Amino acid sequence: MYAKSAKYYLYWIKRLLLIVSVLIVIWLVSGIALQLYEFRDSDPDRGAIMNGTDKFGDRFSQVTYLAQGWSASDSLWFYNTSQGSNLLPYSFFLVLEQSDSSALFRSDENIDRYGYLPQRPTISNPDGLPVGMVRDRYQGKNYMGFTCAACHTTQINYAGTGMRIDGGPANSDMESFMIDLANA
């Protein structure tokens, strides 16, 4: 009788362990798959807006990239990989208006004023945040934060062409950005 009872419990323990193991594998695979978007974004234009005027009044109608061996995926990974700098709630940043108007704080014109590079939406940047600004998740909530690219990507516009330099010093004014963000 004891042997039959032990086999019965052992059978159910094995089944339970199998179910738990399968659930853990599914959870791990799902988590990895959700993070892989950073590595599959290979937009050939790297999310660059191809027409514009910078804060100095220089116009450009195309963007090229300094030949430094970076693929489109490399650039987009650099632009959109969080550094854990959770600045403010993401949903708040998306709808935040400028302090002196009803225009969005994140509008291309306003972002360009600070020397940051406006972007169009891509797989890894679905809301079209500027280069170096990213959605990050912390304790179950989404935040807007900065990546290394905020301070280390620049674009020089000359003769109608924007030359994007990934990893170079940005031509941005973070102090004014932060002051105006606080005022908004």
Where are each of the predicted segments found?
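N-terminal Sec-pathway targeting helices
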Residues: S5-I26
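Conserved structured core elements
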Residues: L10, N142-G145
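Flexible gly/pro/ser-rich segments immediately N-terminal to CXXCH heme-c attachment motifs
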Residues: D136-Y143, G167
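The canonical Cys-X-X-Cys-His
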Residues: G145-Q155
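Extracytoplasmic c-type cytochrome modules immediately beyond a signal peptide or single-pass transmembrane anchor
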Residues: G31-Q139
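Short Fe-S-cluster ligation motifs
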Residues: M174-A184
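Short, solvent-exposed loop/turn and secondary-structure capping segments
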Residues: N157-D166
